[in-house]
Amino acid sequence: MASAISVSVHCPGAIAGLSAATAAAVVGVPAAMLAAPTRSRPTVARARQLAVYLHHFALGASVSACARLFARDRATVRNALARIETMRDDPRFDHCAARLQAAIAAQRDMILALIAEGAAQ
């Protein structure tokens, strides 16, 4: 968890955007729409819920941090987390979500390693 904190100090956008970009690409919507201040069509809402879930569980972000990143309140973030957890009851979706979490965690680790290499030079 400490590594996620150090990244937020050095390059907040490098890590924060991983969940949104991944969820948007998988669902097929523009990533910029995930933080739009208005309600969106169901496809965008589902992508946002997935992004919130990935940001929270794959990157270890707090509910408050997720709320700030996606321009939502904490209750909405908790609702998104619950909806995706329910969707994970479907084995196919669960497999997909697990792979997305692993991919985002791997990207985070790669970015952290590059930061560490740069700091060592």
Task: Identify the residue ranges that each predicted region occupies.
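Helix-turn-helix DNA-binding helix
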Residues: T76-R78
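Short Lys/Arg-enriched helix C-cap and helix-to-coil transition segments
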Residues: R88-Q107
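Short, Lys/Arg-enriched anionic-surface-contact patches
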Residues: A25-R48
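DNA major-groove recognition helix of helix-turn-helix
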Residues: H56, A80-L81, R88
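Short, amphipathic alpha-helical "recognition" segments used to contact nucleic acids or chromatin
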Residues: A45-G60
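General nucleic-acid-binding
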Residues: M1-A21, A113-Q121
